[in-house]
Amino acid sequence: MTKPAKSEETRARILDAAIELFRARGFEAATMREIAAAAGVATGAAYYYFDSKDAIVLAFYGRAQRQLEPLLEEALAGKRDFEGRLRALIEVKLSYFAPERGLLRALAAHTDPAHPLSPFSAQAGEIRERDIQFFERLLRESRIKLPADLGPLLPRILWMYQMGVILFWIYDGSAGQKRTHTLTEKSAVMVSRLIRLSGFPLLRPARKAVVELVQTITG
């Protein structure tokens, strides 16, 4: 095995060991020393690859995004209508993260954008932007005529809508998270209709308010 390959294998082993420990003991309780021991490396080696548990979680998110992207491509290719494609993008993520639902629930406490583990943080920016690109593509390929003020913001709005669904799913106690799937189905229809109606003159004041709100949130 070449040195770069061995280094990548060690990094992956530490990441996998950490995720197992986070599942078993919780993110807050697990220590870097325990992670190193579980991975079979020295504590210093664990810190060489990841300077903190936060860095490990960001690496987990990054790996998940890379693994999800071909699945998201398939999801878009498998549907033709806007609602179906929007729903498919979300359902692919729910399916992928199902084994990690407990871990995501623990990490959901860190939603403050100032926290590095927040999906809204600067540290998560690259992962977030890669995901937003799929919503950009969804809108572009739908050929829905969008108002000039709303169009550039809409991919980010759809991404935030998706994050709301995922947060609901994390805490959904219904059997098989049935309520989430119902929410996704019904809300995708509503979102689609609102987007198609957004250019109507009568909705201009409401649209302006939405645009200003999103601009405030995103800075």
PLM segments and residue spans:
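Secondary-structure edge/capping motif, primarily at the C-terminal ends of alpha-helices
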Residues: 75, 79, 107-115, 142, ...
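C-terminal peripheral helix-coil segments that are non-catalytic and often amphipathic
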Residues: 133, 137-140, 171-219
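Hydrophobic alpha-helical connector segments
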Residues: 59, 73-106, 118-121, 125-127
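Helix-turn-helix
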Residues: 2, 13, 21-59, 63
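Amphipathic alpha-helical packing segments from all-alpha helical-bundle domains
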Residues: 117-143, 152-164, 182, 188-193
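Short amphipathic alpha-helical elements of helix-turn-helix/winged-helix folds
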Residues: 17-21, 96
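Short acidic, glycine/proline-enriched loop segments that cap or flank alpha-helices
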Residues: 145-156, 171-175
